[in-house]
Amino acid sequence: MKMPAMGLGTFRLKGEPLLATLNTGLALGYRHIDTAQIYDNESEVGEVLATTSVPRSDIYLTTKVWTSEFAEGKLIPSLKTSLEKLRTDYLDLALIHWPSPNDEVPMAVYLEQLVEAKSLGLTREIGVSNFTVTQLKDAIDILGPGAIAHQQVEIHPLLQNRKVVEFCQEQGIAITAYMPLAYGKVLSEPILMEIGKYHKVSAAQVSLAWLLAQGMTVIPSSTKREHQAANLAALEVSLSSEEMAQIATLERGERCADPDFAPVWD
């Protein structure tokens, strides 16, 4: 199954709010759910997958392996546990959530386990998240060209991550933009508001449309039905080349996700 360009992000959502969010999203037409081991919500995602009328084969499911599961012999059992919680026998995409902090576990150790997970049928595609260009190059050296299908990374008009984006595009690595609305910071950007006014859409929809126009997948997180519907409607927003260029001027390196164990960013 090809990854749908619009997905449901589940970061910081748990329990009943998450169940309601996912069921509403599926009813609206979303067919892509993004979760992670560290989110501690795979069981809720699994409950929805088990009870929805939407067939599992119609839903693109991603989870991410946490850094505590990288050591030799740990990654595959951790993914099997994720599958049990998710109540499914396969993932569409399994990602390395972050590079091993301070390279405590050699990259080859966890990437080779991820490849094995794919060969065992636990996941259909594999990829990484939050990797720098140097780390992506190292990963390609370890696994060979074409092995890494995907990179998930923070991208929005205020943090455009151009070096990483360009490298991924050169290598044929698909990109998912997380935090595509920069925790709502894009909503008050005058350029986005002005473009939105012209198209009769919101600044948030313009931000999403800008990412989508570059061939990226986006996974905004929202618990409100009207916001979920508006995000989906961004798929229909068509920006001119002039508008795309205007939005490109908003770059200011405003990173939202920068934990102390993050790599040295490009």
Question: How would you label these PLM feature ranges?
Answer:
Residues 56-69, 90-99, 154-155:
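A short, structured active-site edge motif that brings together acidic residues
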Residues 1-59, 113, 182, 263-264:
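N-terminal binding-site loop/beta-alpha segment at the start of enzyme catalytic domains
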Residues 32, 90-93, 125, 150:
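Residues at the N-termini of beta-strands
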Residues 43-50, 79-83, 114, 136-140:
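Short, well-ordered amphipathic alpha-helices
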Residues 99-266:
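Beta/alpha (TIM)-barrel catalytic core signal, keyed to glycine-rich beta->alpha loops juxtaposed to Asp/Glu
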Residues 75-96, 116-120, 142:
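CE4/NodB-like, metal-dependent polysaccharide N-deacetylase domain
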